[in-house]
Amino acid sequence: MNTIGGYFVENLANCKCKKDSMIIGNKYRISILTERLVRLEYNPKGVFEDRPTQRVIYRNFPKVNYTATQSETLLQVITSYFTLDYVKEHTFAGSKIAPSTNLKITLNGTDRTWNYNHPEARNYGTITYSLDNFRGKLKLDKGLYSTDGFACIDDSDSLVLNEKGMFQNRSDKVLDLYVFMYKKDLGLCLQDYYKLTGYPLMIPRYALGNWWYKDSTYTNQDIYKLVKKFAEEEIPLSVFLLGNKWHKENDYYTFNDKIIDPLKLKKFLDSKQIKLGLTINPSSNIYQNTETYNAIAPSLSQDNQLNFLPVNNNKLNLYTYNVINKLINGGVDIFNIDYNNKGDKLTSSLFNQYHYVAEVTTLNKRSVVLTRNHNVAIHRYGIVVTGKTIVDWETLAILPRYNYSASNMGISYVANAIGGYYKGIEDFELFIRYIQLGVFSPMLILASDDGEYYRREPWRWDISQREIIKKYLNLRNKLIPYLYTEAYLYHTSGSPIIQPLYYEYPKIYDEPLYINQYFFGSQMLVCPITKKKNMIMDRVVQRLFIPNGTWYELESGKKYLGNKYYMSFYRDEDYPVFCREGSIIVMSLDKNTDNPVNLEVDIFPGSNGNYTLYEDDGITDSFKNGAAAITEYIYNYSKNTYELIIEPKAYQGLVPPIRSYKIKFRNTNSASITVSDGVKNIKATASLEKNDLIINIPSVASSSKIIITCTGNELENSTIRLINDDIKGILEDLEIETILKEKIDKILFGDLPIRKKRIEIRKLKRKGLEPKFIKMFLNLLEYIKTV
């Protein structure tokens, strides 16, 4: 089936609910889809919809155990999760005074009830349409997650898919609601939602790398020069996304003359393993005597200018064949749809769906579309862009919470303009905090408006700053094996890649100092820095909440005991990311997004661990037929013996035949090492690097099992994080006389009570200690006091 519907709906029969799960009246139909999910339809004409919609593509859920009791006027339905009471044939809406008069759904075992038009005020919210020009307080849209334990999705206005596989308006004005009654089982709610609307896309592997977007006018030579500069700086780049200035002035769908040969450009980018993307606005006018006009005018009414809006099936087909396919055949890999119309989300959804399907069917490759959030099952095909955000700290401060709130609607791929898009003041500290957030987010796009003074190019900062940027953009590329595995888990199990702490720790929702923290995949915790540093100590004072268990800082390896609050200090080059005890982080040491030849595997002590690395060709759907490589990493931990087993479990033809490994046992002392395949030894070398034990295995067959055993007396070294160490580091970096530093050290870390320490610090003014330093050390004493 070559239609858009045929791509998303494999079997139309699955769009119809089972007969014995439906209760049908003259004007209503109630479908019990799962024990937590009920569909409510009301149509005075008594006609109900079994076709798929833009949002809903599956209703053939297994039969649910429920009881239905009814009289001539009343209906009651009971499942293990909810009890529904309905006055038959009445509209679902009650009066303003008694809104649940006609319909009420109660969560069993609670006093919480849902009714039509319920405000759902305790909903945690999800991402909005965009953050274009954001200012002020963040207001989120309604998501699925609520402390009430219920949420409703209104599908009444969605287009339906007809028998020809094309979308059309509904014939009647109806109510078509899906009510999720899940108590505290958000994970099960998301499973119901994904089955109803489709599971998330499997993102192409290249999309997880570093993107470049600057809305400038480029020539071929400009692009060649920029790409080569990234290579010279040893900064990986995976996508080059053109802004709104790639097309002709009077033809918004044809390359301008500055890009002389798009296919030649495409060939160059392919040679550098970089994908080409375009920004496109499907609402742009089409003017007479242009290439696009001449192609579509015979099929539309003649006019001096044409437009694909308002959309209909004829226009969408013309758009597909004369715009999308033309550009795909011209070398375009990705589309950024800049149809910025918050009031017309259904049209935005249509364009996204047509772009996605056209690319998949034309190139026989996985597709991905960038778009603002129309919130119509966008998890199936889209990367949500937050829009043209302002370059400032205020915007950065709301991004972590905004990004992870997407998970409350089953969405993972949210892309911010890293650095901010426009306006504001270019500032390195702000820029690096944006980059660090991007590294530990599902997407990273260096982006800005056109303008000479927007500095997104890493080499335009001074040398020390450039090295920090380079460090993090390379770290992003290193993390791709981990990210791609987490993306696969999201695609198959529906577990969002980033998740707020309040899923496990509801109290965090009401603690503004910690609300921005989130889990990044299954192994990491991120505590984003979104405020300016203290210029005197040259560090940010960051408050942290560490969850249950033992956690280790990703970079330093410092140990943090869980279920505790901390205060730490971070320089520009530092970022608070933590790994659980027993975590195994598999990373790439190559400078591209391919399945790596050279891997680094970081293992954190404290408990047993395992991780299943997933790899495939990164671009096609062949993985659906089993074309994938699965490698198990198993870590057996004891006080005096560490064992790591690397065991290939599935098809290995998609990975390099020979691989090299850098195994990094974090916080580990010197040990006796053996490396084997279980039968014979494998050549390897061992060394100590800072607090870590490094084992290098130069080359081994990817199909080989590897067993690494470390034995010694108390292998884990003591790296418990101490605030005194942080403060000593601050003191060491300050430009203060060394003799004064010694006096300050004795005061800060001596046995005097805090009150007397304050007095002694103030006395140092007589010794020449400047007031700004006195104030800083008094504040540090307060920090010590609170820890």
Language-model segments: what does each one mean?
Residues 106, 110, 117, 236-469, ...:
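Aromatic- and carboxylate-enriched substrate-binding clefts and catalytic-loop regions
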Residues 68-207, 214-216, 227-232, 504, ...:
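Catalytic and substrate-binding clefts that recognize carbohydrates or anionic sugar/phosphate headgroups
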Residues 30, 38-42, 77-84, 525-528, ...:
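Short, well-ordered beta-strand segments enriched in hydrophobic/aromatic residues
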Residues 582-787:
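C-terminal low-complexity, glycine/proline- and small-hydrophobic-enriched intrinsically disordered tails
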Residues 133-134, 213-259:
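A conserved hydrophobic secondary-structure block that centers on an alpha-helix together
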Residues 367, 377-384, 399-402, 406-416, ...:
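Catalytic core of carbohydrate-active enzymes
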